[in-house]
Amino acid sequence: KQQFITFTVGQEGSPDITAARMMSEHLGTDHHEYLFTSEEACSIIPDVVYHLETYEPELIRSAIPNYFLARLASKYVKVVLTGEGSDELFAGYLYFRDAPNSIAIHKELRRIFHHLHNVNCQRADRMTMAHGLEARVPFLDPNVIDAVMQVSCLRSSAVLYECNSL
């Protein structure tokens, strides 16, 4: 039986790195990670811009970890499942905690999904292809998005707030 392989990248002390380590240990995955410095991030900007084919600062900033992640994963696999869109789909960003109610969260989720698909797919595709890696984005599948968005606002909000308190 083949062991599930997981990857994460970031900077030391990142809560995402800590969470990835915990999940890997819990699930028993073959976990690989790469911790990059600010200097390393700055040094790859020309490559990121080249592969993204844009000078858009926010897209470049968000593509830097994807670049490191694709470079790491390409040493082990040819195809990856990414988490692109999961933070948006399940209201995982901190600013969602400040929403006045579940209806506001639902409205914001609907708003951001009009633009998310193109930006996230472009970034994931171009950074993985830069390293000969294919990325699949299951959280951006229209059927997954539709199913999650049909969950009652009140129910999804209760789940969100319960999970955030863990």
How should these model regions be labeled?
Residues 1-166:
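ATP-dependent adenylate-handling active sites, centered on carboxylate activation for C-N bond formation
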